[in-house]
């Protein structure tokens, strides 16, 4: 719903509630639909909508009592946990469709340079590539308008098929340009991984006689009598590349966004609708033909446009009995919530199914659009947990958003655009073989190298000047500040080496200018995953939202709230009476205020509370479900586990107990991560900015020294140590007491 007018104030569409977001910023929720106000762009004049999920910086707001009030500097404080490994990452990549079919016609020198930029460890460092097997339109255009794709994705989308009619010989000389790029990639990057994928079967196998889809975009276009011939067509192309060039595709994907109604006759690109049942039938035909080919290639599927459809497709394949014939699951993330992402990750992990984010891109304007896609990348890596992340286009002519280089196919001119450097902030430094580890802030991405001696932190800021206060106390060893390297991309910088950070003990403070992305490389002594321990405090985080934490209110209510690392969010697992000697529980979960989690299943209630008095329902088991996630279940009623009410994940959502059953195929709102606060741990900077004015604000702080912008300039200072600070006014916090000091 777009808000262009003021509606009747008596309607729910005109009623809003305010929720704390980050620091001094809030979310504004519409009562009418339960969604948040936000924009689609950072540009001046952008329209405001009330259909946002509240997860993006463009959904955050600041209230000033003055028309010209200064927006406060925000400090985001959080901990990085090297022991909580999320996934082993294989690397980055891009589709070859359609840019390679154009750039492959260029001079050898220019091809060499753009492929070097693409594959070099000092370039984009990409190693996964998707080769498009063209279907090929009717050369006589009997059922379609000549060059109809020129009105959509451009003539570049016209793919050459290897046959002109059923029974024709293969014309292996076709698609020379895309092939030339692919072989150059292999030359430059011997460890490159290739996937073959199809957007459509050849025109002569279709109902419409047109390779862009059926006359009705919601109906299948491949005739069932051609299933076997199309399967042979795909496998024969794969086998040709193995026999002729020694290049074996790791995977073969026969579908592309096929349950949508995007693909229609005379459309803008090759495309082919397949109902779920049709896909199941085709997989049953394709698998034995591929197995008989002698190739090691496996089938991947099913490359749907959004993650919610990927979840539905996965279930359809399982129900259709063909999931075991699939060796890799692919999804695009053009849309989908983080809840969809964790559903997909959980399903794949349960079946040990490799998972790729195989295509995405985004529009927008300037660096704002580039950073918006970077946030989507962060969401994918943090919640979907793919092994590989794939860009859609490398080169474009008409824009600088859907690509990393821009130029003219005809003139053979090209240049790197800002998006190239934004992507490098991740792809150049997080290499294949790295592990993605846990950081409790959605504007951060953390990774460890295989030797566990280097931490990569990528920090994102889509808004105004921000500081990240990163607690590194969970690492066994930390560097001197001079050993840390940092690189930043902003509207005026492109992977520039910067020194806008400080390290005080285990507290890393990083300055992020307006609309910027920063990568830090830190030599560290990493740790390995361990079992749950007694006498260690944990922050208990819901899988659906890594910025929230299990929280007990003074009145005993248990909810998830913004993670402030407060005493009411710090839980210990204490062995209950009669617990097993092997440390498997049950446990009493008690926070630093002495409140114990208490369920009420015996009375038939789903209620969960935190109380200081004893109860017979204060014992829980913590069972690993999908590491690093766990099920926390009642000891007396083992099938009942901690649950996010109505599967919500926003601040204030009540936590209850609900049945965790085997037939619930995506119970991710009943899964929790236990984040151990070993060593220093503790509060990590400003917990909340309660006042809405820049001139008068209150803050709950960790012990330390803060400037008036809210930045922690000195952590945990002792009463006797001397510290050099610039002249100015500071707030000193010690044991909850704040004092203003002028220097």
Per-segment meaning from a language model:
Residues 229-236, 240-248, 258-363:
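Active-site neighborhood of glycoside hydrolase catalytic domains
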Residues 683-743:
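C-terminal outer-membrane/trafficking sorting elements
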Residues 1, 9-43, 55-72, 528-555, ...:
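Extracellular glycan-recognition/adhesion modules and their associated mucin-like linkers
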Residues 439-479, 515:
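Carbohydrate-binding surface patches
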Residues 75, 81-250, 284:
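N-terminal catalytic cores of secreted or lumenal carbohydrate-active enzymes
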């Amino acid at each position: 719903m777009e808000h262009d007018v003021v509606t009747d104030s008596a309607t729910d569409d005109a009623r809003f509630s305010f929720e704390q977001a980050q620091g001094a910023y809030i979310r504004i929720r519409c009562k009418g639909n339960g969604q948040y106000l936000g924009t689609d762009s950072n540009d001046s004049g952008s329209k405001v909508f009330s259909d946002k999920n509240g997860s993006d910086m463009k959904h955050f707001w600041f209230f000033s009592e003055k028309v010209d009030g200064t927006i406060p500097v925000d400090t985001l404080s959080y901990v990085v946990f090297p022991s909580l490994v999320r996934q082993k990452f294989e690397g980055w990549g891009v589709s070859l469709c359609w840019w390679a079919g154009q750039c492959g016609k260029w001079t050898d020198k220019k091809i060499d340079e753009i492929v070097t930029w693409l594959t070099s460890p000092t370039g984009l460092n990409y190693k996964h590539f998707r080769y498009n097997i063209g279907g090929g339109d009717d050369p006589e255009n009997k059922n379609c308008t000549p060059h109809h794709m020129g009105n959509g994705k451009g003539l570049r989308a016209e793919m050459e098929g290897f046959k002109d009619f059923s029974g024709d010989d293969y014309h292996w000389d076709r698609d020379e340009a895309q092939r030339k790029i692919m072989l150059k990639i292999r030359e430059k990057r011997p460890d490159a991984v290739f996937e073959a994928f199809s957007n459509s079967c050849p025109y002569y196998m279709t109902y419409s006689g047109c390779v862009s889809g059926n006359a009705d975009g919601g109906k299948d276009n491949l005739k069932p009598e051609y299933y076997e011939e199309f399967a042979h067509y795909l496998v024969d192309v794969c086998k040709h590349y193995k026999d002729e060039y020694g290049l074996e595709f790791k995977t073969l994907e026969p579908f592309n966004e096929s349950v949508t109604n995007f693909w229609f006759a005379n459309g803008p690109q090759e495309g082919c609708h397949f109902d779920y049942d049709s896909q199941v039938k085709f997989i049953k035909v394709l698998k034995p033909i591929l197995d008989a080919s002698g190739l090691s290639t496996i089938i991947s599927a099913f490359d749907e446009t959004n993650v919610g459809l990927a979840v539905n497709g996965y279930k359809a394949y399982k129900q259709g009995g063909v999931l075991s014939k699939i060796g890799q699951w692919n999804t695009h993330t053009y849309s989908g919530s983080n809840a969809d992402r964790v559903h997909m990750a959980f399903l794949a992990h349960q079946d040990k199914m490799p998972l790729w984010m195989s295509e995405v891109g985004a529009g927008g304007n300037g660096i704002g659009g580039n950073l918006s896609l970077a946030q989507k990348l962060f969401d994918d890596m943090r919640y979907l947990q793919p092994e590989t992340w794939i860009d859609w286009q490398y080169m474009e002519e008409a824009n600088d958003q859907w690509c990393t280089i821009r130029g003219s196919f005809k003139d053979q001119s090209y240049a790197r655009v800002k998006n190239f450097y934004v992507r490098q902030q991740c792809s150049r430094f997080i290499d294949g073989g790295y592990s993605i580890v846990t950081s409790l802030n959605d504007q951060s991405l953390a990774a460890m190298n295989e030797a566990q001696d280097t931490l990569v932190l990528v920090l994102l800021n889509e808004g105004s000047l921000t500081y990240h206060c990163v607690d590194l106390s969970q690492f066994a060893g930390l560097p001197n500040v001079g050993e840390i390297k940092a690189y930043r991309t902003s509207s005026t910088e492109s992977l520039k080496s910067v020194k806008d950070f400080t390290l005080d003990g285990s507290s890393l403070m990083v300055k992020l200018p307006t609309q910027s992305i920063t990568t830090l490389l830190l030599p560290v002594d990493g740790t390995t995953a361990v079992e749950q321990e007694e006498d260690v405090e944990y922050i208990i985080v819901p899988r659906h939202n890594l910025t929230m934490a299990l929280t007990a209110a003074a009145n005993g209510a248990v909810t998830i709230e913004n993670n402030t690392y407060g005493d009411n969010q710090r839980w210990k697992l204490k062995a209950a009476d009669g617990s097993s000697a092997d440390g498997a529980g049950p446990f009493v979960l008690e926070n630093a205020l002495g409140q114990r989690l208490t369920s009420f299943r015996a009375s038939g209630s789903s209620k969960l509370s935190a109380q200081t008095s004893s109860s017979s329902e204060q014992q829980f088991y913590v069972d690993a479900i999908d590491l690093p996630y766990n099920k926390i279940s009642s000891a007396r009623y083992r099938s009942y586990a901690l649950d996010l009410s109505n599967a919500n994940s926003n601040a204030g959502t009540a936590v209850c107990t609900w049945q965790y059953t085997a037939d619930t195929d995506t119970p991710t709102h009943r899964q929790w991560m236990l984040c151990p606060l070993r060593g220093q741990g503790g509060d990590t900077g400003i917990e909340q900015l309660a006042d809405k004015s820049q001139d008068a604000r209150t803050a709950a702080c960790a012990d330390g020294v803060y400037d008036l912008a809210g930045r922690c300039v000195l952590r945990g200072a002792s009463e006797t140590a001397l510290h050099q600070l610039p002249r100015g006014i500071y707030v000193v916090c010690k044991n909850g007491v704040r004092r203003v000091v002028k220097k």
